[in-house]
């Protein structure tokens, strides 16, 4: 009998992507996050679909429709908690996935890396518009503050902000269009994921050593399907623990109050996964400058391949670059902490120093470290 998975036009694509795919024999658990992100996306789309069946995108009923989902819909509380905490798991996996790419030099597959950065931006946009939908206090004021940043763009800013709002402030039109965006974007993300995988399979996976693994490849199934299954179990354990035991621990208490344009919360802040960028935005006392720094903090990932100066691809055998990488990690954690603090001393100066260090590490210190390591590894007479 002819093996169907090797002959059927559709099964053949799946076979070459997930079953008979030649994979390096030495890839570590840091390579699990790609498949985990795929699982997160599927969980978010499925839970989101069921939430959309009961949600109403109207300023008068949005908040109560979310309450209705949690109180009256069968397992609605679970679906909502999985969706809200699934977003946190999604971003945790995303940050670890990007960090792995930087540490092991995966960014030198430029097409895959660039699509990945576009994916990151798209997921961030999706999460932002999704956070507005429950129409609580922090949803409303978060939407107001972030969309207001568009007005910092010279000449067209105010017109652009009002165009996004569909009026002169965040209101019914804004909520309706944000729901439309939040529904369509995950499907765009799915398409981009396919392009991401297409480019990845053109070159094959990188590996911890950073050297060409062509001489030693193994089939993806069963070796890495089993390895990914372990990661999946851990992901589901953490997600279910969060959703069942502590579903509101990552949310903001202000979002339990319905949106009120007449009452501003004392501290407006986004979800934890945006706090690092929010801290960079706040560290510059100029509106346009802050917006540019905010954009630069994410878009800087696009130029990382151009800043690679080392002769070795991976940081595995580069202790100076490793040290700088972990300083960058600690710096991002510091920025995340600062983003959640009120705008007062000493948090202002800590945020400004951490923001300067963030850009200095990526643009100056890491390329210099690569050049220094090249020099140290040159044979001396």
From Swiss-Prot:
Protein's name in the database: Cytochrome b
Gene: MT-CYB
Keyword Iron attributed: yes
A GO CC term attached to the entry: respiratory chain complex III
One Gene Ontology term of the molecular function aspect: metal ion binding
Cofactor: heme b
Binding site for heme b b562: 83, 182
Gene Ontology biological process terms from the UniProt entry: mitochondrial electron transport, ubiquinol to cytochrome c
CDD domains: cytochrome_b_C, Cytochrome_b_N
Organism: Sminthopsis archeri (Chestnut dunnart)
One Pfam family here: Cytochrom_B_C
Amino-acid positions noted as binding a ubiquinone in the UniProt annotation, renumbered to this chain: 201
Note: Heme 1 (or BL or b562) is low-potential and absorbs at about 562 nm, and heme 2 (or BH or b566) is high-potential and absorbs at about 566 nm.
Residues binding heme b b566, per UniProt: 97, 196
Record family assignment: Belongs to the cytochrome b family.
Transmembrane segments: 33-53, 77-98, 113-133, 178-198, 226-246, 288-308, 320-340, 347-367
Domain of life: Eukaryota
Quaternary structure annotation from Swiss-Prot or TrEMBL: The cytochrome bc1 complex contains 11 subunits: 3 respiratory subunits (MT-CYB, CYC1 and UQCRFS1), 2 core proteins (UQCRC1 and UQCRC2) and 6 low-molecular weight proteins (UQCRH/QCR6, UQCRB/QCR7, UQCRQ/QCR8, UQCR10/QCR9, UQCR11/QCR10 and a cleavage product of UQCRFS1). This cytochrome bc1 complex then forms a dimer.
Xref: PANTHER family: CYTOCHROME B
Record keywords: Electron transport, Heme, Iron, Membrane, Metal-binding, Mitochondrion, Mitochondrion inner membrane, Respiratory chain, Transmembrane, Transmembrane helix, Transport, Ubiquinone
InterPro entries linked: Cyt_b/b6_C (IPR005798), Cyt_b/b6_C_sf (IPR036150), Cyt_b/b6_N (IPR005797), Cytb/b6-like_sf (IPR027387), Cytochrome_b (IPR030689), Cytochrome_b_C_euk/bac (IPR048260), Cytochrome_b_N_euk/bac (IPR048259), Di-haem_cyt_TM (IPR016174)
Function: Component of the ubiquinol-cytochrome c reductase complex (complex III or cytochrome b-c1 complex) that is part of the mitochondrial respiratory chain. The b-c1 complex mediates electron transfer from ubiquinol to cytochrome c. Contributes to the generation of a proton gradient across the mitochondrial membrane that is then used for ATP synthesis.
Topology in membrane: Multi-pass membrane protein
PROSITE patterns named in the record: CYTB_CTER, CYTB_NTER
Cofactor binding remark: Binds 2 heme b groups non-covalently.
Subcellular location: Mitochondrion inner membrane
């Amino acid at each position: 009998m002819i093996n169907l998975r090797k002959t059927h036009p559709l099964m053949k694509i799946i076979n070459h992507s997930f079953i008979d795919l030649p994979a390096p024999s030495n890839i570590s658990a840091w390579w699990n996050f790609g498949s985990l992100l795929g699982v997160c996306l599927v969980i978010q789309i499925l839970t989101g679909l069921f939430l959309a069946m009961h949600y109403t995108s109207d300023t008068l009923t949005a908040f109560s429709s979310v309450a209705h989902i949690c109180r009256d819909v069968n397992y609605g509380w679970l679906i909502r908690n999985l969706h809200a905490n699934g977003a946190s798991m999604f971003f945790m996996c995303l940050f670890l996935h990007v960090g792995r790419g930087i540490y092991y030099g995966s960014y030198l597959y430029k097409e895959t890396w660039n699509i990945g950065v576009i994916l990151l931006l798209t997921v961030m946009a999706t999460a932002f518009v999704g956070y507005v939908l429950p129409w609580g206090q922090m949803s409303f004021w978060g939407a107001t503050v972030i969309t207001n940043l568009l007005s910092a763009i010279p000449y067209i800013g105010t017109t652009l902000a009002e165009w996004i709002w569909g009026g002169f402030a965040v209101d019914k039109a804004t909520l309706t269009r944000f729901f439309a965006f939040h529904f369509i974007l995950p499907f765009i993300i799915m398409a981009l994921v396919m392009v991401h995988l297409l480019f990845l399979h053109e070159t094959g996976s990188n590996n911890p050593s950073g050297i060409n693994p062509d001489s030693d490849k193994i089939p993806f199934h069963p070796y890495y399907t089993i390895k990914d299954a372990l990661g999946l179990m851990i992901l589901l354990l953490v997600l279910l623990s969060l959703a069942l035991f502590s579903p509101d621990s990552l949310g903001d208490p202000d979002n339990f109050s319905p949106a009120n344009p007449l009452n501003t919360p004392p501290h407006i802040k986004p979800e934890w996964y945006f706090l690092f960028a929010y801290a960079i935005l706040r560290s510059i006392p100029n509106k346009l400058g802050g917006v540019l720094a905010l954009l630069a903090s994410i878009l800087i990932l696009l130029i990382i391949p151009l800043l690679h100066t080392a002769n070795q691809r991976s940081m595995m055998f580069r202790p100076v670059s490793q040290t700088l990488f972990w300083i960058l990690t600690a710096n991002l954690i510091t920025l995340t902490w600062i983003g959640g603090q009120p705008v007062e001393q000493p948090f202002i100066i800590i945020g400004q120093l951490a923001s300067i260090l963030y850009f200095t590490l990526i643009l100056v210190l890491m390329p210099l470290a690569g050049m220094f390591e090249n020099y140290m590894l040159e044979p001396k007479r």
